[in-house]
Amino acid sequence: MHLRIHARRSPPRRPAWTLGIWFLFWGCIVSSVWSSSNVASSSSTSSSPGSHSQHEHHFHGSKHHSVPISIYRSPVSLRGGHAGATYIFGKSGGLILYTWPANDRPSTRSDRLAVGFSTTVKDGILVRIDSAPGLGDFLQLHIEQGKIGVVFNIGTVDISIKEERTPVNDGKYHVVRFTRNGGNATLQVDNWPVNEHYPTGRQLTIFNTQAQIAIGGKDKGRLFQGQLSGLYYDGLKVLNMAAENNPNIKINGSVRLVGEVPSILGTTQTTSMPPEMSTTVMETTTTMATTTTRKNRSTASIQPTSDDLVSSAECSSDDEDFVECEPSTGGELVIPLLVEDPLATPPIATRAPSITLPPTFRPLLTIIETTKDSLSMTSEAGLPCLSDQGSDGCDDDGLVISGYGSGETFDSNLPPTDDEDFYTTFSLVTDKSLSTSIFEGGYKAHAPKWESKDFRPNKVSETSRTTTTSLSPELIRFTASSSSGMVPKLPAGKMNNRDLKPQPDIVLLPLPTAYELDSTKLKSPLITSPMFRNVPTANPTEPGIRRVPGASEVIRESSSTTGMVVGIVAAAALCILILLYAMYKYRNRDEGSYQVDETRNYISNSAQSNGTLMKEKQQSSKSGHKKQKNKDREYYV
């Protein structure tokens, strides 16, 4: 008796689980791409403009910091809708501190910094940008021995660039522009020649994980005293943000905002400019002015024992004293930058700020200050007409202040102001009463050719109007004669900020971007800010090789790192699922079906047990089942 078991393998079922694995594989790829695109799109809304960056590393001691990929930001963030804010730093020092959120700290390969300032101090820090603690990267704009300079470190050694030609602590308003691209840098003050620096050797290029911007130098013990206006750094207008009470900004010490629009001027009609006509810096220069001869007016000279220089009045006493003055002889020159410590100020300021000068500074100047009996002069003088308020009572001449430190002028809008509202002004903008009998047909302001068509000229009253202008040094040195038979007196630099005050609506022309006026085709990848005009951009190339200026690159470290981690985790999880599914299908695969055939064969006689007969039986069995040898297997029991 033997059992016959037929083993038949069923057809393979591979296509079912193979399709499942393929489905999971493509799902893994699609999910990874989707997660990466979501992270990139969410990061691009808050990152700054930049171009492609290479994968670079900084080595600070034993720490190794990897730099993620760069994120693009719209160039629109470089523009604003109004002029830059202005802050006065008193003699006791102050600090404006902006701190980036912990998850939004940028790393940059190139930087742009610009600010307007005026001061008389010989040493002080204007702006300093520091990286996160432990990294040591920084960028600092400072005045040393009266000269402006920048020092920065991005991982190797301190690199410095300085304007050696002329001191900038002369009390005049200056605009400084700094660009960095890798280790190369440029520095320009006003329209002076550009200083360039190309360090030798291999330099690291990334300013890692920027954490805070400190303005004023109080945290480093090098106090800045004077005025700062329209600070711009890589798309951030920090002073504007401070004026808007940004939660990431803290203000300490003797710091005062000027240029606010008070509630009493809430009904004043102003003009709004498009973003293309906005800028962040307002520049003033020492100017000439005519004054109305009045009774009870006198001049007061600076006492040699005092270091304070009062700038914006016609009498030496405070306006609250109501002290009448004797007539002045005219011809006085006043330095336009003067501030004071703003500790106790009245609700409506009646006095301009003053600044403490060095003990060795004894200017032989006379100062004139306005008392309240001079307020009638404002109504007589009038104000420049707004371009959108019609042309009644106005002529064709209008004078405004240039946005660059070279004395350029152009037409703009200047809303009417109240003589009492000092805090609506930028404290260093000088206002003058220009008689049309003297300046008839003259001093017509001209804007640069590429931007002159954006403005309509203001008009001045036939009698006289209070206007603002910046004149050449030759005109500043002019002194009026006291003879009654000559033209009216023109005392130089009368600082009366209360008669006419520039408003935040005064908008200066920005620099042309990479799009030219007559064409919308992009000529170069250069991204400019309103204060960078014709400033060469230093590129991180080999020494002596200079390329076309590149765009600022800002890398959002936290968002890109998060996206990378999410993508890796998702891919790893999907791969593990695929592996588990494959193992499950392998262990539970179909081994085939088996059929057992039981038959009984009885031995009829004992002779069949002989070996010969057994062989014949086996041969006959093989021949009988020859067709089924591949299907059936016989097992003898």
From Swiss-Prot:
Coiled coil stretches, renumbered: none
Gene Ontology annotations of biological process type: adult behavior; angiogenesis; learning; neuron cell-cell adhesion; signal transduction; social behavior; vocalization behavior
Positions annotated with a glycan in the UniProt record: 184, 252, 296, 312
InterPro entries reported in the protein's UniProt record: ConA-like_dom_sf, Laminin_G, Neurexin-like, Neurexin-related_CASP, Syndecan/Neurexin_dom
Subcellular location as annotated: Presynaptic cell membrane
First-listed, main subcellular location of the protein, grouped into a coarse class: membrane
Positions that bind Ca(2+): 137, 154, 206, 208
Residue ranges, compositional bias (Low complexity): 43-52
Region feature Disordered, mapped onto this chain: 43-65, 289-310, 605-637
Repeat recorded as keyword: yes
GO annotations of cellular component type: cell projection; plasma membrane; presynaptic membrane; trans-synaptic protein complex
Comp. bias (Polar residues): 298-310
Pfam families registered for this protein in UniProt: Laminin_G_2 (PF02210), Syndecan (PF01034)
A molecular function GO annotation: cell adhesion molecule binding
Positions of transmembrane segments: 563-583
Residues spanning the signal sequence: 1-35
Residue ranges with Basic residues bias: 55-65
Family: Belongs to the neurexin family.
Job description of the protein: Neuronal cell surface protein that may be involved in cell recognition and cell adhesion. May mediate intracellular signaling. Functions as part of a trans-synaptic complex by binding to cerebellins and postsynaptic GRID1. This interaction helps regulate the activity of NMDA and AMPA receptors at hippocampal synapses without affecting synapse formation. NRXN3B-CBLN2-GRID1 complex transduce presynaptic signals into postsynaptic AMPAR response.
The protein, known as: Neurexin-3-beta
Originating organism: Homo sapiens
